[in-house]
């Protein structure tokens, strides 16, 4: 792979916010004109592997913030573990990927609520989180009695004062201990739901999106946390690739953007050339007329063995 030249230091920015206009809203003539008049720029390709899910994000990189579309000038990290508030979309994406990387359909999805006697004070999310922590301590006590290690988990605490159920917790946990024993460790209500996780074609992404999405960002709050020792999603960024997985010379990612920005079919074809062990799921092509550049995302999944 060709090495990047020294001095090519790029600034971080929110490329998903910067390029938020779908190419489907433009006709082919304007797409061609925009590409012709766009400045030459370095494109990066980010690969994110999480369990059997695989995502690709292609975006332009810049050296100066004034080159970035205004919508994208806030700086966020994809996997900033200190960002525990799920009002931030990058935190939501990270939690979705963390769940896909660490859990399977052998594991558990728990939803716990409160009866009136045990409701946390309105708005006191820290008090609600303490209840989850007590639950986890009880779970780990029961696991120790059975010779099991501490639980692996990700939990989301949600509060919305306008909902009938103002407080609830979603917990994704390994399924090494009996479900009834796990449920019995929650003492704040008997109105709970405990079930095995079920993967679909997008792995656990649908379930993960459900528990992290915000219905009302102004009045509601969601906070997440996880056990120690979970595997991070594997993230790799490159600036050049071969035309196919194992053939041809390396070309800059921008060369492929010239073809892929023409439509979803072109994106699908290129992804299957690059990643033949994966099935294509979906893609999106976005632009910003601030600088006539593109952001392309694709989702794939590991091909199942026949």
Label every model-predicted segment.
Residues 1-165, 175-306:
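Right-hand nucleic-acid polymerase module
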């Amino acid at each position: 792979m060709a090495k990047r030249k020294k001095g090519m230091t790029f600034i971080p920015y929110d490329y998903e916010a910067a390029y938020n206009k779908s190419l489907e809203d433009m006709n082919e003539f304007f797409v061609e004109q925009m590409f012709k008049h766009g400045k030459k720029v370095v494109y990066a390709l980010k690969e994110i592997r999480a369990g059997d899910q695989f995502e690709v994000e292609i975006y332009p990189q810049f050296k100066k913030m004034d080159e970035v579309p205004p919508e994208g000038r806030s700086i966020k990290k994809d996997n900033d573990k200190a960002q525990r508030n799920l009002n931030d979309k990058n935190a939501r994406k990270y939690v979705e990927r963390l769940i896909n990387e660490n859990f399977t359909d052998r594991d558990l999805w728990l939803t716990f609520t409160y009866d009136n006697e045990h409701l946390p004070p309105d708005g006191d999310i820290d008090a609600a989180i303490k209840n989850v922590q007590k639950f986890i301590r009880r779970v780990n006590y029961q696991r120790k009695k059975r010779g099991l290690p501490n639980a692996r988990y990700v939990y989301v605490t949600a509060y919305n004062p306008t909902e009938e159920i103002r407080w609830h917790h979603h917990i994704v946990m390994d399924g090494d201990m009996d479900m009834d024993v796990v449920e019995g460790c929650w003492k704040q209500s008997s109105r709970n739901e405990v079930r095995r996780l079920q993967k679909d074609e997008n792995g656990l992404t649908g379930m993960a999106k459900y528990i992290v999405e915000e219905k009302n960002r102004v009045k509601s709050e969601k906070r997440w946390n996880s056990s120690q020792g979970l595997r991070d999603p594997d993230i790799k960024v490159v600036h050049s690739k071969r035309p196919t997985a194992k053939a041809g010379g390396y070309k800059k990612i921008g060369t492929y953007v010239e073809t892929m920005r023409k439509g979803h079919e072109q994106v699908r074809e290129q992804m299957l050339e690059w990643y033949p062990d994966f099935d294509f799921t979906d893609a999106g092509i976005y632009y910003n007329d601030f600088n006539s550049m593109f952001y392309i995302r694709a989702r794939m999944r590991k091909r199942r063995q026949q």
